Regions:
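Short, solvent-exposed polar/charged micro-motifs at secondary-structure junctions
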Residues: 24, 64-65, 90-94
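A short, charged, amphipathic alpha-helix used as a generic interaction element across diverse proteins
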Residues: 35-78
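Short N-terminal "domain-start" leader segments
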Residues: 1-45
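Short intrinsically disordered terminal tails
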Residues: 1-4, 87-94
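Intrinsic disorder/low-complexity segments
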Residues: 15, 19, 31, 46, ...
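Short non-domain terminal segments
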Residues: 10, 27, 49-52, 90
Length: 94
């Protein structure tokens, strides 16, 4: 039986908004629709980069829960560095 690999990936970025609020957000680039793609990309580009990568498509729902937990921690003021983010997401990264 051949080994099956997941070739579909979800590209994402965690960033901090450039606006006064400075909230941490995520954008899933490969899931954007045509009507909101340009706006979302511009907002992410104006923000401060925190972490980016590719999620395995088949694991994306579980990965998004982890990303949401990371965002909650960041927005509460916790110091969550790139190494910690990568460790939390490691099982879901492509």
């Amino acid at each position: 039986m051949p080994l099956m690999t997941d070739t579909k990936k979800v590209m994402f970025e965690i960033y901090r908004e450039a606006s006064y609020s400075g909230r941490y957000k995520v954008v899933y680039f490969t899931e954007l629709g045509e009507h909101d793609k340009e706006t979302e990309i511009q907002e992410a580009m104006r923000g401060e980069h925190v972490f980016d990568g590719f999620l395995l498509h088949r694991e994306r729902n579980q990965a998004k829960q982890i990303v949401d937990e990371i965002l909650e921690r960041l927005n509460r003021g916790e110091d969550v560095d790139q190494t910690t983010i990568e460790q939390n997401l490691q099982p879901y990264l492509a």
